[in-house]
Amino acid sequence: MNPRLRVYIFAGIFLFIALIILIKIFFEEEKFDVLVVSLDSKEKTSKECLSNLQSVSIPVPALIIDKTVLKAIYQENCEHIFERKIKIGIDKRNWKLIANHNESSIFECIRMENKTSNDYLQFDTQPARAVLKNFNTFSIGNLHIPSNIPLFLKMWERSEIRGCLNLIVHRNMTKSQQFNHGKEAAEKLAEFRDVLLTFNMFAFLNGGTLLGWYRECGFIPHTADIDLAMFAEDFHPEITHFLLSRTSSFQLLRSLGMLNDSYELTVTPKTGYIVNMDLFLMYKDVHKNGSVINWVGGASNDIKYKYTYPAYDPWCAADLHGHLFWVTCSPQKMLVFEYGNLWYEDHPSSQYDWRSTAKNVRTNGLWSDVELKNVSKLY
């Protein structure tokens, strides 16, 4: 056989084998990949809604924020949208341009602030409100309508702003420990917030992260992780498959508990600033007298723990280093319940035992030997 031909044959065989191996690796790695799609999006509405909205004009861009009108557009039934004024958000930089607009009887114009340093829009309503601004819209003239109306309405329900206290915290025992990357941590937390939103999951600040935001408008310097919670009924288990995929920008480190009992996930960013984030599921118990408590769980070996709260109300919004996060509407009440009346004083993390220090923690039974095999998973 011609030596040159022999070289070509062997090279061809080698390339073929390499191609087969690459294809095999590709499909094995891709088997967990999930296509994340924002649900309920639309870029159009009915002819009736289109005709009605085209019949009015506004000289500057405006965002429809009226809940009734948005629901009508989504349901494609706009017969009654002009029975009262339509609430719209106007960028405050354009406010003077609408001062004498002759359609003022149709619209209730609300100032809207769009700071480039923030990832949210703020509205001068009473009380003030804020929603994330990374949503798509479609336009009818100068009227802009959220493409994903159900998601926007969920954000609006959680948009009432709560402020933090920015207290000066004396740290004689922990002053040498500094969390110097608060902005980077908030940015990664915002990225994880957005991942959860693609699954229609709304998480809220909890535990020490809630305390740090409310007390000092940041993260507690000597904490090592970030705490989030969300209602168990809103959790979508598919997210665990996504977090195990190459597509995810976060790595799933572990899961604890079961979906109906003391479940939590720990994730960390794959790139950039690295900080662990714990996502706890929050459950609801209804007592015989009708009173409601909420709780999140924890576990140490086979012992289960339960952190209880009064009926939880995570329907408000907060700023943390220019990023929007959701929080309880009564932060001080919840912090007193968890940390006691001296919640505003620093407590070194080295002296904090999560199994006993909190005021709202108690044991909650044991995992059985069978359960123990499944309740703790490392990835």
Swiss-Prot record:
Keywords: Membrane, Transmembrane, Transmembrane helix. The chain crosses the membrane at residues 7-27. One of its GO terms (biological process) is protein glycosylation. One of its GO terms (cellular component) is membrane. The keyword Cell cycle does not apply. InterPro entries: FKTN-rel, LicD/FKTN/FKRP_NTP_transf. It comes from the Eukaryota. Signal peptide: none annotated. It is a single-pass membrane protein. It is found in: Membrane. PANTHER family: FUKUTIN-RELATED (PTHR15407), RIBITOL-5-PHOSPHATE TRANSFERASE FKTN (PTHR15407:SF28). This is Uncharacterized protein T07A5.1. It comes from Caenorhabditis elegans.
